[in-house]
């Protein structure tokens, strides 16, 4: 039986394999969630570069957030990464939720990124 870590890695790889099949050259909006913070970056897999990034540890967000571990913080990060991605010239991405289910903080981040101008 697989350990929790092995199962997490297997789920993340499965999601990434599905994303690469439908990406068509679009950058990937990759999300990582920890118990205290949430991190997101827009990655161009063809060039191997990060085009935009944001997290609850950003100086511009950290002072305005009560905690980095709630849906309000995730929505603020989603809006910030959308602004930075649009400024970098990215409007269409594929959403990489990794091994995390599309619920709660992940869903709040995705909806805020859509409202901020990203389409996926």
UniProtKB/Swiss-Prot annotation:
Signal peptide: none annotated. It comes from the Bacteria. GO terms for biological process: translation. The keyword Nucleotidyltransferase does not apply. Transmembrane segments: none annotated. InterPro entries: Ribosomal_uL18_bac-type, Ribosomal_uL18_bac/euk. GO terms for cellular component: cytosolic large ribosomal subunit. Pfam families: Ribosomal_L18p. One of its GO terms (molecular function) is 5S rRNA binding. Keywords: Ribonucleoprotein, Ribosomal protein, RNA-binding, rRNA-binding. The keyword rRNA-binding applies. This is one of the proteins that bind and probably mediate the attachment of the 5S RNA into the large ribosomal subunit, where it forms part of the central protuberance. Part of the 50S ribosomal subunit; part of the 5S rRNA/L5/L18/L25 subcomplex. Contacts the 5S and 23S rRNAs. PANTHER family: 39S RIBOSOMAL PROTEIN L18, MITOCHONDRIAL, LARGE RIBOSOMAL SUBUNIT PROTEIN UL18M. Belongs to the universal ribosomal protein uL18 family. This is Large ribosomal subunit protein uL18. It comes from Allorhizobium ampelinum (strain ATCC BAA-846 / DSM 112012 / S4) (Agrobacterium vitis (strain S4)). The gene is rplR.
């Amino acid at each position: 039986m697989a350990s929790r870590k092995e199962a997490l890695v297997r789920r993340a790889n499965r999601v990434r394999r599905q994303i690469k099949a439908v990406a068509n050259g679009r950058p990937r909006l990759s999300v990582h969630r920890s118990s205290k913070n949430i991190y997101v970056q827009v990655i161009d897999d063809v060039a191997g570069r990060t085009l935009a990034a944001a997290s609850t540890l950003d100086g511009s967000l950290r002072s305005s957030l009560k905690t980095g571990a709630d849906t309000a913080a995730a929505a603020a990060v989603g809006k910030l990464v959308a602004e930075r991605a649009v400024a970098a010239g990215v409007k269409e991405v594929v959403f990489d939720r990794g091994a995390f289910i599309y619920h709660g903080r992940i869903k709040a981040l995705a909806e805020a990124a859509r409202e901020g101008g990203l389409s996926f």
